[in-house]
Regions:
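Active-site phosphate/pyrophosphate-binding segments
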Residues: 1-15, 108-184
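Predominant activation on well-ordered alpha-helical scaffold segments within soluble catalytic domains
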Residues: 27-30, 34, 78, 133-137, ...
Length: 184
């Protein structure tokens, strides 16, 4: 995001789009972005339900889209990304698969690097997507503060602390694996 500061710092309206398990991560990201007041308007759209009227009718440079996909190949999400690009809307990708269609189509993005999922429930990718969206929300909040000359609020500080504690929390949870196996 820093490399594209001039472009992304102009975004006032953000749309998050995804399908399947990733739509839940998108909804979480929307709530965080609203809580942190990152944008004037934040919405989440299931890419399968998307239509052309879902983009706000404002200048393209003030609009952004975050496309979230585990595989990076989700056709409905890729379609929304292409619609955004055709309108010169800034598109960011949050994908798990390096070199995927969505990763190649967007101008910037984040690879989750959660590893391959082996189950229907996308727990690893979902967890990684939530963390990445939290970091993206913090970046935009920090940018808004920088441009507006304001300072970080309590919600921002709490989110940063929670993210810093994640490795310890996950380590503790993994340490309970044997106990859970015995109980089960």
């Amino acid at each position: 995001l820093d490399k594209n500061f001039d472009r992304v710092s102009q975004i006032k309206n953000m749309t998050l789009t995804a399908c399947g398990s990733s739509i839940n991560a998108a909804r979480f990201g929307e709530r965080l972005m609203k809580m942190l007041d990152c944008f004037d308007r934040v919405t989440t759209i299931d890419a399968a339900d998307f239509n052309d009227d879902d983009f706000p009718n404002i200048e393209a440079r003030e609009t952004g889209i975050v496309a979230i996909s585990q595989s990076g190949e989700t056709k409905d999400v890729a379609h929304v990304v292409q619609q955004a690009i055709d309108r010169d809307i800034t598109a960011l990708g949050v994908v798990n698969t390096v070199g995927s269609d969505i990763a190649r189509a967007v101008k910037m993005g984040v690879y989750c690097n959660a590893g391959q999922e082996y189950a229907v429930a996308s727990t690893k990718a979902f967890s990684a997507q939530v963390v990445v969206l939290a970091l993206i929300a913090l970046w935009f909040r920090q940018t808004r503060d920088y441009l507006g000359g304001s300072h970080h609020d309590l919600d921002t500080a709490r989110l940063k602390e929670a993210l810093m504690r994640l490795p310890i929390s996950f380590g503790m949870a993994l340490g309970l694996r044997d106990s859970c196996r015995e109980i089960a």
